[in-house]
């Protein structure tokens, strides 16, 4: 045998192994922005030789994780293709059938132009909440359309920009009426035909705040001296109570008794039936799911709330309003923000800080695309098929509970009920088994004539009768609701609902809105405490698979096997990441997860005979949701001081814990802290609270700094909520959806919500906090995909890179802006706070001026004035490549140069590029330019912008004008005539 040539041996030594080649296909390389060489350079800037050395310096040794995060079969990462294939196999265990179960969830056709250009479009789904209005005009307009749609269909005065779901909206309406009503009663009456899941969430919310929930026939609503009444319109079983006079008399009676009325209304029905605002409702709530948003096994969907004008300043949730910009042109913004938890804390109208913007945009665009006539046709067709189905069932010999309905029939089926239910499933149709003698059938826009005939055949076979002829039956049916209940008022008359009915028009309208906004598809969004990381396409793909999107939340268990497996695996993944023993995925938002966690703590104390424990210690630096959630959970908030370094003041904590020892329920801390540092004394904080009988709630908002490196369940936490829309890659959607799982130690596991749906003992659970057992189930595959593709080492690398990037930004900017808080060794966690107050004192330039000027550079602003007024908080995340980090740093340095020119007098203190930012194209191109700086300085402060320029569509929004002149509906087209 010939010996190998020396040159061949050398080549073989350089030849990569197959394992090397496969490793380079790892998803972590796609998710983590800085390359290995770039990370080395960044570490060099910080004075470290390795990422491990940096992490050792940042994270206190006492809490450093040593177990390597046991992810089981997901410890090793899957490639994108392998993860998709594995999840496809799991999804294939679900069975997609036609679900006519109803109960607030209906089949719907998502128009392709909306599916592709909103739900599947990163320009929409990667955007943040529009707190910076100048770069959010597109989605603000879309949400204003949503508000106008709800206002018109409900005939109310004002609507908010979506709620988490219908059940949450009902619970919020209850607390709203308690706040604003004049009644001293503690009774809230819920009609017995309200959706069961709504009633359960209302009960959960009522108990800790001392509200007594009473149920009974809607006709008895005025007999219970209730401060509020909740009616379903139409009822859960489909029935309408009577004619218009019946509804008016009912609301009049409630008002005369000192109460107020909430109507839970079906928006599609309101295209045909008199609106609740026309028969006396004070608040109208509901769900917009059937406006083009799939079942998704229960969510996410956009709930809604509309109120009378007198209640607008007490309404929870976000509200889009119209104001003017610096040039006097109309501009959209979030209005009345002083109601919200991030400002009013425990005095807020609600703890909600997540809406359902992406789903609300879809629903509003469904209305825009179909228009008033199109929606009415859909409703008329659904009703015609429902009336035809009813007539045929009567002809076969069945009795209906009500002859007045919109789309839902309750059929008296007697001893045939169970067999009929099974027979319908055998024909590919799910019905609702109400009890052992009745079946419910809810029709929707996906139902066809063939479906009606198939149902007749099932029912006829059971009755040993012949099915009727469709055409003959349909020809003889009349509308199945009272003539006086027919809607007479116009709706959706604004031009936006009457101009975009061709697909070309709609496509271009959606593109025009997206072009107005900054999202992650254009630029980094360095918002502190928000974790705006990559939402990878591979993670998003499964969301629209029919096996996930077309499953009804109340579908039989044998049709949801795949969902249960995926959910169980994700829960185990999250337990591994947090160090806790159990997780519930039910909460629809971080705020809801917080609330659930506090209810769990209360239930735990009560189970031990210590229900009197109601004091919640909260550091002064905490996020506003913390005190708002504690208040909602019936707890007394006691504030703990922070020291000059931003850490919890241990002496003050010991004092407050001892002072309230007998009644101490919990402490709520965020870790790393909201000041962006790993506090060295966190274990001592936990020990102090535990020694006084309290539980430790670790807010998981900053979990992106701990996955793989530290675990709250290991260093003393008893319960945490997570934000899957931060740490685990669910996109923010412009302000929702979100998922806020609650994770607990073993001793708290029996109290988790949603345990019954998982087949576990639910005797001690706190009750449901959202409408669906698994919350926003259809977006859970995003987090499953992320974890499966990253594996344990990849997740840890992501955390370490996030910390590296934050410290790199802080180090580079420190010579220009003071970094307010640092931990040991002068380092930060995954975010840093720049103190603008000294500069403002010297120059008059505020953090807001800098935030608005960043828009001229093509950047979204960092978080303003949280947790410290007059600051900017920056969180770059692990996904941003070094070139983007440097582009942002260069912009901030250039802005500091402009501030220096103000200080030196080269720029006027009032007439400078910062005070007038952002600059629109119209301003820069105007014939008149009277500023003391050049157009080029305004629009192109750095040369790179010439190749890549974003133009804000409006100038700086006037917040004061907007709140003083509150207008929260679509702007008349005459306002835009000048454009």
UniProtKB/Swiss-Prot annotation:
It is an enzyme of class 1 (oxidoreductase). InterPro entries: GcvP, GDC-P_C, GDC-P_N, GDC_P, PyrdxlP-dep_Trfase, PyrdxlP-dep_Trfase_major, PyrdxlP-dep_Trfase_small. It comes from the Bacteria. Keywords: Oxidoreductase, Pyridoxal phosphate. One of its GO terms (cellular component) is glycine cleavage complex. GO terms for biological process: glycine decarboxylation via glycine cleavage system. One of its GO terms (molecular function) is glycine dehydrogenase (decarboxylating) activity. HAMAP family: GcvP. This is Glycine dehydrogenase (decarboxylating). It comes from Ralstonia pickettii (strain 12J).
């Amino acid at each position: 045998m010939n010996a190998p040539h020396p040159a061949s041996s050398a080549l073989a030594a350089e030849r990569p192994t197959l394992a090397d080649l496969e490793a380079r296909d790892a998803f972590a390389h796609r998710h983590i922005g800085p390359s290995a060489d770039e990370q080395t350079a960044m570490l060099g800037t910080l004075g470290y030789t390795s990422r491990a050395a940096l992490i050792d310096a940042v994270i206190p040794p006492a809490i450093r994780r040593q177990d390597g995060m046991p992810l089981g079969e997901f410890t090793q990462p899957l490639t994108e293709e392998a993860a998709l294939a594995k999840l496809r196999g799991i999804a294939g265990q679900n069975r997609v059938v036609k679900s006519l179960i109803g109960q607030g969830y209906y089949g719907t056709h998502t128009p392709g132009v909306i599916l592709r250009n909103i739900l599947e479009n990163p320009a929409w789904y990667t955007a943040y909440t529009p707190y910076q209005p100048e770069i959010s005009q597109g989605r603000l307009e879309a949400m204003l359309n949503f508000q106008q749609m709800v206002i018109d269909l409900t005939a109310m005065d004002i609507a908010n920009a979506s709620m988490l779901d219908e059940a949450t909206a009902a619970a919020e309406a209850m607390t709203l009426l308690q706040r604003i009503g004049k009644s001293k009663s503690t009774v809230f009456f819920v009609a017995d035909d309200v959706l069961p899941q709504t009633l359960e969430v209302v009960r959960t919310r009522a108990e800790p705040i001392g509200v007594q929930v009473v149920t009974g026939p809607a006709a008895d609503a005025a007999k219970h001296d209730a401060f509020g009444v909740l009616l379903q319109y139409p009822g859960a079983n489909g029935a309408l109570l009577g004619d218009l006079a019946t509804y008016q008399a009912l609301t009049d009676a409630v008002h005369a008794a000192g109460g107020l009325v909430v109507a839970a209304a079906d928006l599609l029905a309101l295209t045909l039936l008199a609106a609740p605002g026309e028969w006396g409702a004070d608040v109208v709530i509901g769900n917009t799911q059937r406006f083009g948003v799939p079942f998704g096994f229960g969510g996410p969907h956009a709930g809604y709330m509309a109120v009378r004008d007198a209640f607008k300043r007490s309404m929870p949730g976000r509200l889009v309003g119209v104001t003017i910009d610096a040039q006097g042109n109309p501009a959209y913004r979030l209005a009345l923000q002083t109601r919200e938890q991030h400002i009013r804390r425990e005095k807020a109208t609600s703890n909600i800080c997540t809406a359902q913007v992406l789903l609300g945009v879809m629903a509003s665009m469904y209305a825009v695309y179909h228009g008033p006539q199109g929606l009415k046709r859909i409703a008329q067709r659904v009703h015609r098929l429902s009336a035809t189905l009813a007539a045929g069932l009567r002809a076969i010999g069945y009795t209906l509970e009500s002859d007045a309905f919109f789309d839902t029939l309750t059929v008296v089926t007697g001893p045939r009920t169970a067999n009929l239910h099974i027979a319908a499933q055998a024909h590919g149709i799910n019905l609702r088994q109400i009890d052992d003698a009745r079946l419910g059938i809810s029709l929707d826009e996906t139902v066809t004539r063939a479906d009606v005939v198939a149902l007749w055949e099932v029912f006829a076979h059971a009755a040993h009768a012949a099915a009727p002829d469709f055409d003959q039956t349909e020809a003889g049916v009349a509308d199945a609701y009272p003539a006086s209940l027919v809607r007479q008022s116009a709706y959706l008359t604004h031009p936006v609902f009457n101009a975009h009915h061709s697909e070309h028009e709609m496509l271009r309208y959606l593109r025009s809105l997206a072009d107005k906004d900054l999202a992650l598809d254009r630029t980094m969004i360095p918002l502190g405490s928000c974790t705006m990381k990559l939402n990878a396409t591979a993670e998003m793909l499964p969301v629209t698979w029919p096996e996930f999107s077309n499953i009804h939340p109340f579908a039989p268990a044998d049709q949801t096997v795949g969902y249960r497996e995926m959910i169980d695996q994700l829960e185990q993944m999250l337990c591994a990441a947090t160090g806790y023993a159990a997780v519930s995925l039910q909460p629809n938002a971080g705020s809801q997860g917080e609330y659930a966690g506090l209810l769990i703590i209360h239930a735990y104390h009560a189970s031990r005979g210590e229900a009197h424990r109601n004091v919640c210690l909260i550091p002064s630096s905490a996020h506003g949701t913390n005190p708002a959630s504690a208040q909602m959970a019936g707890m007394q908030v006691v504030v703990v001081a922070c020291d000059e370094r931003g850490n919890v003041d241990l002496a003050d904590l010991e004092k407050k814990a001892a002072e309230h020892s007998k009644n101490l329920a919990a402490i709520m801390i965020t870790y790393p802290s909201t000041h962006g540092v790993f506090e060295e004394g966190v274990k001592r904080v936990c020990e102090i609270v535990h020694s006084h009988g309290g539980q430790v709630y670790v807010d998981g908002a900053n979990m992106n700094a701990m996955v793989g490196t530290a675990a709250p369940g290991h260093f003393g936490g008893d319960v945490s909520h997570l934000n899957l829309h931060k740490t685990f890659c669910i996109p923010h959607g412009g302000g929702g959806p979100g998922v806020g799982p609650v994770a607990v130690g073993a001793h708290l596991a029996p109290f988790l919500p949603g345990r019954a749906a998982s087949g576990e003992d639910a005797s001690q659970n706190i009750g449901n906090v959202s409408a669906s057992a698994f919350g926003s189930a259809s977006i859970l595959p995003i987090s499953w995909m992320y974890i499966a593709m990253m594996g344990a080492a990849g997740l840890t690398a992501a955390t370490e890179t996030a910390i590296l990037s934050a410290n790199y930004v802080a180090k580079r900017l420190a010579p220009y802006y003071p970094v307010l808080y640092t931990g040991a060794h002068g380092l930060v966690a995954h975010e840093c706070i720049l103190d603008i107050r000294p500069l403002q004192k010297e120059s008059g330039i505020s953090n807001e001026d800098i935030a608005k000027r960043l828009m001229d550079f093509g950047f979204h602003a960092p978080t303003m004035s949280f947790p410290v007024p007059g600051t900017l908080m920056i969180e770059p995340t692990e996904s941003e490549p070094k070139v983007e980090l440097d582009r942002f740093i260069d912009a901030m340095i250039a802005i500091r140069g402009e501030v220096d020119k103000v200080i030196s007098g080269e720029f006027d203190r009032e007439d400078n590029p910062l005070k007038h930012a952002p600059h629109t194209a119209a301003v820069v191109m105007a014939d008149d330019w009277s500023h003391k700086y050049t157009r080029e300085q305004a629009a192109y402060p750095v040369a790179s912008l010439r190749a890549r320029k974003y133009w804000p569509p409006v100038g700086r929004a006037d917040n004061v004008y907007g709140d003083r002149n509150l207008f929260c509906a679509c702007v008349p087209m005459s306002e835009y005539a000048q454009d």
